């Protein structure tokens, strides 16, 4: 009915519904129905040749209304008829009568209308969003926020009229919008995601695109149409972004990385002498295995220019995730204050020729000032530990000497503990503490960290008694040992050889 009103040249179509009597009245101020007899003929359109060629009406719109009510009255162009819908559907004869003093308003009244009031409201609100003429429900105009005349900036294209959300005048182009909505003859026919999400709007050319009968709510060859729409959106978006590049300063344009990426226009950054912050990260703390989480890297917020990179003021490295390449490369990057290249740029971007590839180069670990070795056994990790003054990491021609942070060498299954680290954080480099169900076991990790901390203190203490006390477990669960004194004897390998109670 809305489509018929639009085709009739109406400026508005109104719906009035009285729930108590289930009476729906539809009115419009269009040119009216030329022939009520044609209206009652299945699959015969009463529209002129121009509309038939442009929009291909098939004469089934009115027929569908007959299935939704019990009785119908139609009044238009000085003629009217009334009939039970079951009689019309049975093709019984209908008497068409003249109307005295017709007021110029086409009126269709449906009695015994089947849908509920809320259904009617929800349905009309959805249909009105992109409709080209005013839609009124119970004297209240419905929102038409996606209509061509809604104040949005539409561009004429080969597929129809296109509005690019975020890339129109005075809109925030940094606001990334992945959704789009397709309308045909003002009615919705496709949504890339939920309809409630605002996004790009395309009013398809009805001479090129068609919808399936009888409801016309689905496109014919939908997959092909959607693919073409995506190509046009990408092309139109690129044109807008090229214009923005000419208008904005390099730092401001680089801020649009996510938008450029969404439109497949990252190549527009190739000659911009400022790096987007989205492509850079830094190792923000002692690096450990991440498992299902990602927390080793933080976004580098400071601006980095092409000059910073070319002069060596800033060094940027390629580095795969911790779980793939291990601790040594990450410790090297952390202690060398390297920035990490973490997101993709176009293959022709100037930065790619100046990256330090930490993944491809071998890393050499040198232990300096080794004192002794001991075996650590926690709940989830166990390995030999080497205690030393410091250790050196070398990649290519660059090296770093570390004396305050322990390292787990997964190749040698070895904890390297320099004199400046008495914490247990290094166990996190040997295990992510995620089980086979990807659940993080915080209590086990904390227990292993505490045990390793005691293990380090015990192995670096100059007082043997203090070292022993650190290594002894808790005896809270054994009351028989409370308030007792014991003498322990250890053998040459550190195993308990004898325990004697002192009375």
Residue ranges and their predicted role:
Residues 1-17, 61-66:
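Conserved ATP-binding N-box helix of the HATPase_c
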Residues 21, 31, 35-39, 46, ...:
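Charge-rich (often acidic), low-complexity intrinsically disordered regions concentrated
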């Amino acid at each position: 009915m809305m489509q018929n009103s639009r085709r009739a040249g109406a400026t508005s179509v109104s719906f009035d519904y009285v729930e108590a009597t289930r009476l729906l009245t539809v009115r419009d101020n269009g040119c009216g129905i030329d022939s009520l007899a044609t209206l009652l003929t299945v699959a015969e359109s009463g529209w002129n040749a121009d509309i038939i060629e442009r929009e291909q009406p098939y004469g089934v719109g009115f027929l569908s209304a007959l299935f939704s009510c019990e009785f119908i009255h139609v009044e238009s162009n000085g003629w009217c008829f009334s009939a039970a819908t079951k009689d019309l559907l049975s093709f019984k004869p209908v008497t068409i009568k003249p109307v005295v003093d017709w007021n110029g308003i086409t009126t269709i009244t449906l009695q015994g209308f089947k849908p509920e009031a809320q259904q009617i409201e929800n349905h009309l609100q959805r249909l009105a969003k992109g409709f080209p003429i005013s839609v009124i429900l119970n004297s209240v105009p419905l929102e038409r926020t996606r209509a061509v005349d809604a104040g949005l900036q539409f561009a004429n294209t080969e597929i129809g009229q296109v509005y690019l959300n975020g890339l129109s005048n005075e809109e925030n182009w940094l606001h990334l919008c992945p959704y789009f909505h397709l309308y045909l003859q003002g009615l919705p026919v496709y949504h890339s995601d939920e309809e409630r999400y605002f996004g790009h709007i395309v009013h398809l050319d009805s001479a090129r695109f068609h919808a399936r009968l009888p409801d016309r709510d689905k496109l014919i060859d939908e997959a092909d149409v959607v693919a073409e729409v995506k190509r046009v959106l990408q092309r139109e978006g690129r044109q807008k972004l090229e214009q923005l590049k000419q208008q904005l300063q390099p730092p401001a344009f680089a801020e649009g990385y996510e938008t450029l990426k969404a439109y497949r226009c990252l190549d527009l950054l190739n000659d911009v002498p400022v790096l987007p912050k989205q492509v850079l990260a830094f190792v923000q703390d002692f690096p450990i295995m991440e498992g299902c989480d990602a927390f080793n890297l933080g976004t580098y917020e400071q601006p980095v220019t092409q000059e910073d990179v070319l002069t060596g003021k800033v060094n940027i490295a390629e580095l795969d995730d911790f779980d793939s390449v291990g601790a040594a490369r990450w410790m090297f990057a952390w202690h060398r204050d390297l920035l990490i290249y973490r997101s993709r740029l176009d293959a022709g971007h100037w930065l790619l020729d100046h990256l330090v590839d930490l993944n491809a180069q071998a890393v050499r670990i040198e232990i300096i000032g080794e004192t002794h070795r001991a075996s650590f056994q926690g709940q989830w990790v166990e390995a030999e530990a080497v205690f030393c003054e410091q250790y050196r990491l070398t990649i290519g021609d660059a090296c770093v000497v570390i004396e305050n942070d322990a390292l787990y060498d997964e190749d040698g299954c070895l904890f390297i503990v320099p004199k400046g680290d008495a914490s247990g954080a290094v166990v996190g480099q040997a295990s992510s503490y995620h089980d086979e169900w990807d659940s993080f076991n915080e209590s086990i990790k904390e227990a292993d960290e505490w045990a390793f901390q005691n293990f380090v203190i015990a192995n670096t203490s100059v007082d043997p008694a203090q070292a022993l006390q650190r290594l002894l477990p808790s005896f809270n669960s054994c009351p028989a040992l409370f308030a007792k004194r014991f003498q322990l004897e250890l053998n040459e390998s550190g195993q308990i050889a004898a325990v004697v109670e002192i009375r």
